[in-house]
């Protein structure tokens, strides 16, 4: 009986170790990928389309002489698209906050300042009706609906342009040539229901 137990124990141990030695080479034939998932659960009735989470709007080149004449450059259109909107929506509220703006700078986005930056200019934002969007001030837009129900996909159309900080033609030579780089965060604060 003792011999049978020893033989059985030896057989079990041999099979365990042989399985381990056979499994080890398989580990050398595999590779791994680490997967990190991110997301956010919100109480908002719309979400920003992931393709619009980060945008670069190229405002082009503008001469100092054009700013002397008109005080602003041509407007460039862009949009922030929203998805998964609740059908009971009747308006969307948003705020644009400038990353370099202080409390008194509400007419335009203040550009970053460095050795190659233009001076005397800002980046102005307006809606698609050319109405000014003040920095840090909540703005309300109606939703697009069909049959009294808001569409699932909505869009906030906007325009941006480079202009003098006074908003007028640069008659005193306050504008200098250089790069203009401004950044902002647009927050969809809430979406109203009827």
Swiss-Prot record:
Domain of life: Bacteria
Cleavable signal peptide: 1-23
GO terms for biological process, alphabetical: cell adhesion involved in single-species biofilm formation
Keywords, comma-separated and alphabetical: Disulfide bond, Fimbrium, Signal
Intrachain disulfide bonds: 46-85
Gene Ontology cellular component list: pilus
This protein's record includes keyword Signal: yes
InterPro entries associated with the record: Adhesion_dom_fimbrial, Adhesion_dom_fimbrial_sf, Adhesion_dom_sf, Bact_Fimbrial_Adh_Pro
Compartmental location: Fimbrium
Main subcellular localisation: other
Family per similarity comment: Belongs to the fimbrial protein family.
Protein name as it appears in the record: Fimbrial protein 987P
Organism: Escherichia coli
